[in-house]
Every structure is written in structure tokens, then in C-alpha cells.
Amino acid sequence: RFNGPREGPVTLQHGDFRLDNILFDVQGGKARMGTLDWQTVSCGHGATDVSYFLSAGLPYDVRRAHEQDLVRIYHEELKGFGVKDYDWDTCWRDYKASAVHGVFMGVFSAIAVERTERSDALFLAMTRGGCVQALDHGAFDLWA
């Protein structure tokens, strides 16, 4: 069960990490990127932000074709920065279980934010992306 106590490294999670919340080449090129909208920050598994980023930002077929390679790169980078005791299988499981985050974000955002044509389309896409990813990985079963 994924909704019980979890072990492993935790980090600062953005919670709404998607392309709309990232600026590139900021401060006149002094910084390569900056991240906006920190209202949903929390502590947890970093794989949640990775999972949400891919479900909210990639077409389903592209995500399916490349997600395991992208998550492996993420895992290798963690190890390169000194994260220990977080094996690939645990990282991949955290990633898959975190797919429900996209569902939560899409639904809760649609409830909390003023409706516009753009926000309706955005939240529908976020929810669909999260649902498809969660179904692809059996994430709802991991939370049972």
C-alpha cells in the first residue's frame, strides 16, 4: 500500500511543477531557469514532481514511449548528487504511485480557481493526463 508510512529520501516538492510554472533564461541570462507558483510546496518524494511534470506536459504516447528513460535519468542524477539508499525499483514505484497527483491537482485546481476558458482547458488536460498515467501504471490500486 502506498498510502501508509513510506521510507526513503524525501525532498522539497513543488507540487505544481509543469511548464507553465517554469521561466527559462531569467534575470537577463544569469539563471537558466526559475520556478513560479510555490503555493503547493510540501515535503515528500521527488518522484511526485517528476510524475506530474510528465503527465501534465507530454502527450500520452510520448510519455509512454520515454517516461522510463526519463525517470532513469532523474534517478541517476539523484545518485550523482549523493542520494543513497534509493534504488531504481523504489524510485520507479514512487513515480508510478505518484501519478494520482496529476488527478488531484487537476480536480482541486478546477474547484479552487476562477473559471475561464483557458483554465477549464488546462485543468481538463491536467486531469486527463493524470488519469491516463495513473491507469497506465495501476496507481489507483497502489493506493487501495
Regions found by a protein language model. Name each.
Residues 9, 62, 66, 87, ...:
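Conserved acidic
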Residues 1-14, 25-28, 126, 133-144:
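ATP-dependent phospho-/nucleotidyl transfer catalytic cores
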Residues 6, 10, 15, 43-46, ...:
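Active-site-proximal structural scaffolding
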Residues 1-2, 15-18, 23-24, 38, ...:
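Tryptophan-centric aromatic hotspots in well-structured domains and transmembrane helices
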